[in-house]
Swiss-Prot record:
InterPro entries attached to this UniProt entry: Papain-like_cys_pep_sf, Peptidase_C58, Peptidase_C58_Yopt
EC code: 3.4.22.-
Protein's name according to its UniProt entry: Cysteine protease YopT
Native species: Yersinia pseudotuberculosis serotype I (strain IP32953)
Annotated active site: C139, H258, D274
Gene3D superfamilies documented for this protein: 3.90.70.20
UniProt keyword terms in alphabetical order: Hydrolase, Plasmid, Protease, Secreted, Thiol protease, Virulence
Pfam families, sorted: Peptidase_C58
Enzyme class: hydrolase
Length: 322
């Protein structure tokens, strides 16, 4: 069975369920070029205990929400337990091992960590793992909310956490992030279009430039595997003579895809957000370019073709608040 959700690809095989289940085999959980192969033979009783513990972990426990319902009466989204949630937890764990290396490298290139955040671990993972459409990650929705918050002169993390500190979640923001991801995962729906519609409702618009006497959105695509990072970084750092711009960046490879975001300002530098690592700031574009090229690309594992190291798409946005 092949399944692709969010930015992870998982292949599950040789799994059968029933009262006489004696073994379970998980094969080829792929993240980046790291192929995680876990083959486990379990007795019936041991398997029951492990699955029961996993189900309980996903369906119970302290809520860590500031209130049970959103301000308009909606409950935090969740779906029935699925076996893929176990695999997603494993993949998130692999990604989370890269967090220290990425964060430690920021200062070495003259950058600062604005906020430590990772969807791959901790309380936030515990919230998104409870729904089949968000269990693999909510990078697209997080980037969209980050751009909106920054354009409003606010911090996504002040809106996501009570008091802006990790602990309790603001359920309205958590619900909004999860719902945008869920809406983009529906059948026969283009996730990019869903995000664009959400942006329009929140005062964010695609930047338009004139080409051949027509106004067209700034939409740059290319490859990283054969052409290196110069084309990608040029697209991220180009402000088209305006001096600033919001960037939503899609990275993809043979089996995975991921979204990151940035605010580029010719005067104040680059503020960069990756849902897997947090928010960082570099005082000028050259510092960011060197960090991204010499450190981040490899430390994040994004350089592998099996992961997200083949293609990119960079969209530029404007906001009336800027």
């Amino acid at each position: 069975m092949n399944s692709i959700h969010g930015h992870y690809h998982i292949q599950l095989s040789n799994y059968s369920a029933g009262e006489n289940l004696q073994s379970a085999t998980l094969t080829e959980g792929v993240i980046g070029a790291h192929r995680v192969k876990v083959e486990t033979a379990l007795s019936h009783s041991n398997l029951q205990k492990k699955l029961s513990a996993t189900i309980k972990h996903n369906q119970s426990g302290r809520s860590m929400l500031d209130r049970k319902l959103t301000s308009d009466g909606k409950a935090n989204q969740r779906s029935s337990f699925t076996f893929s949630m176990i695999m997603y937890r494993m993949i998130h764990f692999v990604l989370s091992t890269r967090v220290p290396a990425v964060r430690e490298s920021v200062a070495n290139y003259g950058g600062n960590i604005n906020f430590k955040f990772a969807q791959t671990k901790g309380a936030f993972l515990h919230k998104i793992i409870k729904h089949s459409d968000t269990a693999s990650g909510v990078c697209e929705a997080l980037c969209a909310h980050w751009i909106r918050s920054h354009a409003q002169g606010q911090s996504l993390f002040d809106q996501l956490y009570v008091g802006g500190r990790k602990g309790k979640f603001q359920i309205d923001t958590l619900y909004s992030i999860k719902q945008l991801q869920i809406d983009g995962c529906k059948a026969d729906v283009d996730q990019d279009e869903v995000t664009l519609d959400w942006f329009k409702k929140n005062g964010i618009s695609e930047r338009m430039i004139e080409r051949h006497c027509l106004l067209r959105p700034v939409d740059v695509t290319g490859t990283t595997e054969s052409e290196g990072l110069d084309q990608l970084l040029n697209a991220i750092l180009d402000t088209h003579g305006i001096g600033y711009g919001y960037k939503k960046i899609h990275l993809s490879g043979q089996m995975s895809a991921h979204a990151i975001a940035a605010y580029v300002n010719e005067k104040s530098g680059v503020t960069f957000f990756d849902p897997n690592f947090g928010e960082f700031h570099f005082s000028d574009k050259e510092k960011f370019r060197k960090w991204f090229t010499n450190s981040f690309w490899d430390n994040s594992m994004y350089h592998y073709p099996l992961g997200v190291g083949q293609r990119f798409r960079v969209l530029t946005f404007d906001s009336k608040e800027v």
